[in-house]
Amino acid sequence: MKYIEKYLDYLKVVKKYSNKTILSYYDDLIEYNEFLGNNFKNILNIDIDITKEYLKYLYERGINKNSISRKLSSIRGFYNYLVKEEILTSSPFNSIPNPKKDLYLPKFLNDKELNKIFSVCSENTPSDERGTLIIELLYATGIRVSELVNIKVKDIDRTNKSIKVLGKGDKERIVLYNNHTSRALDIYLNDAYHIFNKKNSEYLILNHNGGKLSDRYIRMIIDKLVRKANLDIKISPHTIRHTFATDMLEEGADLMTVKELLGHESLNTTSIYTHITNEQIKKTYNMAHPRAKK
């Protein structure tokens, strides 16, 4: 257990991983350590047979391939750290390949659904102004909800319509917004923001007490707008992020630009959206082409 704790400290202090990422590593490693304990094995004395047994154990529990790949990545990183620290001479997991991942196509909103949500946005009350700004910002920028709640007013460049956001691993990037978002931002800052800002907060999106709005409350605001639009769908802030990426690619944006705007580490992560656009192309073709209909 002490080696796991040392590794997690390394991820936090040296690698600068977020608390959420470190918690994911913790869960994977504790689960693995419990498996070893149940089989009377020491985490420092593992051979190829045990690694295969663990892989078999994960499959038998019905865990999907993507989750298994993540768990193996966590464990592989742990053993590579032990090799780096000269606690072990080699990693028992380097010879274990990740299972081929299942293709996961993220859910996104179509134009009709998106327009319905925007059509019920209003500025009738301070809460309405805030809700409108939240939807506008999420769709205009493609940012994560964790990035949205941490935007500070000073991070916004209203002249250039850009925002500095703090992404995963505390990495900064610049995202852009449009005229619709600019209008919603002006209305909010000139009215609702002053009503909510009872504690002289530096954050943009505030609750009624003047504190930073929570991720959970933003999800509630989105749910309320979806119900108001009479849509029988369940969406999250991440659905809007997926919609941003899909729409950008469908309208001709290149993959590298979308990658930078989303704050992805790898182009492979962004490329999942090309599968979505290809599926849409196929669907449109089959619906529209005379011979495809028959």
What are the language-model segments listed below?
Residues 1-294:
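Conserved catalytic core of the tyrosine transesterase superfamily
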